[in-house]
């Protein structure tokens, strides 16, 4: 009789592991998503001024100096 309560507690633990599955929505396997949703193509992938960085700012000068020092040590 001692084995029966242990089996019941083991089953309760297994059920607790799978209770979080209720948070996910289930979908049909054969659903065709492309027909239901419009696919929009984005023609512009980046900003027009993406290359307007100042290469002579403090950070760029410090980085260039560190790179030069690193190559001198080798």
From Swiss-Prot:
The UniProt regions of compositional bias labelled Acidic residues, in chain numbering, are: 46-57
Q: From start to end residue, where is composition biased (Basic and acidic residues)?
A: 58-74
Is the keyword DNA-binding in the record?
no
Can you supply one Gene Ontology CC term for this chain's record?
proteasome regulatory particle, lid subcomplex
Q: Which residues form a coiled coil?
A: none
Tree of life domain? Eukaryota
From its record, what is one biological process in GO terms? mRNA export from nucleus
Role of this protein = Subunit of the 26S proteasome which plays a role in ubiquitin-dependent proteolysis.
| Record's subunit section | Part of the 26S proteasome. Interacts with BRCA2A and BRCA2B. Interacts with UCH1 and UCH2. Can form a tripartite complex with both RAD51 and BRCA2B or both DMC1 and BRCA2B.
The entry sums up its family as follows: Belongs to the DSS1/SEM1 family.
**The protein, known as:** Protein DELETION OF SUV3 SUPPRESSOR 1(I)
Q: Which organism is it from?
A: Arabidopsis thaliana
């Amino acid at each position: 009789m001692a084995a029966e309560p242990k089996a019941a507690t083991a089953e309760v633990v297994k059920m607790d592991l799978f209770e979080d599955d209720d948070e996910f929505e289930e979908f049909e396997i054969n659903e065709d998503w492309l027909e239901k949703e419009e696919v929009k193509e984005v023609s512009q992938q980046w900003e027009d001024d993406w290359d307007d960085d100042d290469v002579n700012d403090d950070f760029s000068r410090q980085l260039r100096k560190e790179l030069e020092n690193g190559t001198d040590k080798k």
